Every structure is written in C-alpha cells, then in structure tokens.
Amino acid sequence: MKTTHLIASLAIIACTTAAWFLLGAALSYRTNESTATLQKEVSGVWGPALTQEHPHAWFETPNAPGGRAQVLPSSSQVTVLLASEPKRRGLLWHRTYEVDVKSDYVFTNPTKIPQTFYISYPLPADTAGLHGFAFLLGDDDNPAQSVPGPSGRVTRAILLPASGAVTLHTGYRTRGTNTWKYHFPDNHRIADFKLTMRTNFPEINFPVGTGSPGERAQNSDGFSLVWDYPDVLAAPSIGMDMPKRLNAGPVAARIAFF
C-alpha cells in the first residue's frame, strides 16, 4: 500500500471516528437537556419522589428536654400498594407510579397518670394531591380537624388515661415519580412495626440506604414484600425504585460512542 493511500485511510478513519463521537456527544447533550426539562414537567403533574415519614406523638412534662416527651407508636401496621404507570413524553419514558397507603398506629401512654397526647402524622411533601385521605383517631373521626398545618402535618390532641392506648388509622392515594420511601427517625427504637408492600411489577430494586424485606413472594404480576421490625434501634428506611424503561436517546448515544 502506498504511503498516500495509508494516510488517506487513516484520515478517513479519524474523520469517521470524530463524526461518531460528535454524534454521540450531541445525542447525550440533547437527551440530558430534554430529560431535565421534561422531568420538571412530569414531576409537576405526577409529583416528585415521595417519602412517608413515621408518625410520632408527644406529651408535656418538665422531666423531658424542652418540656416535651416524644413517643413513637407501640405498634404499626402499614400496607402499601405500588403500581408502576410509566408515562412517555417526547422520546423519553418517565418512571411514574400510583401509591395507596393505609396504616394503623397504636400510641400508648407510658406513664401512670393521664396525659394529653399530641399525635402528629406527617404528609409527603409536594404531592400531586392526596385522594381519599383518612385520619381517624380512636372513635373521633371529625374530618374538620384532620387538616394539615403549615408544617405539612396533621396533629390532633387526645387525653389518654394511665397506661391507656389509642389507634390512629390513616390512608391516602397519590402519585409520584422514580422512588417511594418510608423513613424512620434517626437513632430511635422502632417496636412491633410491619409494612407489607405489593407491586404490579416483578423488577424490584431497593434504593441505596434502605433495608431489604424479610419476606418476599412473587405472584402473577409482581411481588408481595414484608418488612418486620419487632424491636429495632435505628431502623433502616424502606423503599422501592420504579422499573426502568429503555429510552431511545441514551441507547443511540451509547451505540455512537461504541
């Protein structure tokens, strides 16, 4: 092969490589730009990644820091139904979902005298609306008082007799994107807690920093998962990532770079 032919071949290869690289870079840039823009639009309609915080109560006493003694539920039964409903905007799939949460929490007065308990249930932030919201404290189901305050919490007061207990029932349906989580307060003891999650998808993946279920059973369209914390200090959060869908832009960019 002549030197000129070799140089020409190398030049063609170099130009072709550069062209593919530029194409891949352009696809990556356009995809990232489009993803950021569309993600905001989708989150505005479907809501962000949602986190449900564990509820708590307190009563006033001079023997506690700040004059308040915090009390966590003595028993918790939580049921979560997660339905993946991916939505397509442009050429991109977004990991949207619907979630139905129902919970029963038992709060117990640990003292030998009657106490006024202030029971607080935090709501997920920036939701796309809570449908069928329920906050039933014992036998009093006055919906007029079950309205969140400025902090995004529903708080009710109830007088509990010595060693008495009351059950708080909560429930709602809403929508979110990417991830759903249930979070516990740091460095607190979680007792008699059980969360059962059912999904309509088999591709289960737990977010970084969350715990794995103690039980799992696959059914026709997804999984039934159980997290059981009978007595755990600093319990890990519980969570689920939505299944990923292949998007044309990132795939084309990887092919171009390859």
Show which residues each predicted segment covers.
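Alpha-helical transmembrane signal-anchor/signal-peptide segments
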Residues: 26-49
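Intrinsically disordered, low-complexity leader/linker segments that occur at the extreme N-terminus
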Residues: 16-20, 43, 50
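Juxtamembrane non-transmembrane segments of integral membrane proteins
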Residues: 44-64
